[in-house]
A protein has these predicted regions:
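Catalytic cores of secreted/periplasmic lytic hydrolases that degrade extracellular macromolecules
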Residues: 2-164, 168-305
Length: 305
């Protein structure tokens, strides 16, 4: 993927971004077996919705969408960064909550599958989810390989990593792509007219209908594409030892995100450290649900499709 990270911006550290207001949005399930998952309302148009009978009691997370501030008009670098984080962080948390709820439901269905209690509707939901996350349902059906692939892919992305890449790729929200195409992650497309043309090579930068779509699409890329298999393995490694998945650790696996390779990774880590973005990976959310149907399958590795 070609990166548009070349937008220049300063990287002085900020001193907090109203943590009391934002921290409750950040959640990470308690790994592993069973994960503690937060309940959410799906937001993206392509979201796989639950049947009413399968929804959890209580209201899920909801985000009131507000237009992006004019970050270019904020003259002080620290103020611009704080505004960018305070605006984007709840939207990242909402998409993560959606992913964690899909994961919770998948783990619940794994438990049912071990007792041969999956209904036809539940099997159809699993097939739909697997299709959405590019997981094959082979001749053996929902075997160990299927569950390993699915649970490596249907999972949240560390908020620090999402914030860092959005900051780098959009110049803290000031780039033309972010303003005109809601593209905060340098994501490209290759059909004529699919996005915003650029000079210097084939393809265009993808145009999104809003920042929510941009975040969801970015997370789907990390969660499904072969180029980011190492990131998913690193995330699962953290889960298996009971750690919160680390954005800094995942960033070190993103050699394929930019043609700059290791230099891009070094820059991500620099921005993450200087702006203390890793602090956003450890906040707790009090709304959790535990799944106790069955122990999760062995998840040491994601099978090759």
């Amino acid at each position: 993927m070609k990166s548009c990270w070349s937008c220049w911006f300063s990287a002085s550290p900020y001193l907090g971004v109203m943590l009391a207001l934002c921290a409750w949005w950040l959640s990470w399930p308690e790994p592993p077996q069973p994960p503690a998952i937060i309940s959410s309302e799906p937001i993206a148009q392509e979201t796989l919705r639950f049947d009413e009978a399968d929804t959890d009691e209580g209201a899920g997370l909801q985000v009131t969408l507000i237009p992006a501030p004019n970050f270019s008009a904020i003259s002080l670098s620290d103020d611009r960064k704080q505004s960018f984080i305070a605006w984007l962080l709840p939207l990242i948390a909402q998409e993560n909550a959606r992913l964690l709820e899909l994961r919770r439901k998948a783990v619940h269905y794994y438990g049912l599958s071990q007792q041969n209690r999956l209904s036809l509707a539940q099997k159809e939901w699993l097939v739909s989810l697997a299709t959405d996350y590019e997981v094959n349902v082979g001749a053996k059906g929902f075997d160990l390989s299927f569950w390993q692939n699915l649970l490596h892919r249907v999972d949240a992305i560390p908020p620090s990593l999402v914030l860092t890449q959005a900051a780098v790729e959009s110049g803290w929200g000031t780039s033309r792509l972010a303003k005109d195409a809601h593209n905060f992650f340098g994501i490209m497309c290759f059909k004529p007219g699919c996005g915003v043309p650029f000079d210097g090579g084939p393809g265009e930068f993808r145009r999104f209908t809003g920042v929510n779509d941009s975040i969801a699409f970015y997370m789907r890329i990390i969660n499904t594409k072969g180029a980011y298999r190492a990131a998913r393995a690193e995330r699962m490694r953290h889960r298996l030892i009971g750690d919160v998945p680390s954005g800094m650790a995942l960033a070190k696996t993103l050699l394929n995100y930019s043609e700059l390779g290791s230099r891009y990774i070094d820059f991500l880590l620099k921005i993450m450290r200087e702006n203390k973005l890793d602090e956003y990976d450890g906040a707790d959310l009090p709304m959790t649900i535990e799944v106790n149907d069955a122990p999760a399958p062995s998840l040491q590795s994601e099978p090759v499709k």
